[in-house]
């Protein structure tokens, strides 16, 4: 799964996205509703309002602020992930699979290793071996006036499967652009996701 990620203090490209979207009318709307979008680098948790890239109504690529997690009628806990293997079949994700895809910029994602009793242990930051922005595949929907997203996950690559059996779908920059466009096959693009990861102990 993916329940935390990081925007690093030196990741200027993402920090510029944050500055840009905090000047928009959407940011004002969030603040009027008592929701504070992030304004700086740090660890990102569910319910945070963060940058995400998607198409606008004209089909143009834009950076938006979105809340991490879908509200659920039957549970207080937010739905934060979608399995790529089954998303097209699930009613909650079916329309987003074909029409409402986004990518979320990150520096790393976070995972904990687990003992035999499935209790979380050491914390690690993880990213692909390639440099640059880590593009996490996502789906989004509107909840009233609030755009909300989930992060798409896949079976973990062998380099990190000893920590957890799931990991986010991470796309190369070109595939991130293809992912958000409605006329492309999301299954095919997800199948080209980055695999081999590098990790560091984070405390």
PLM feature segments, named:
Residues 1-203:
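Short linear sequence motif anchored by a di-proline
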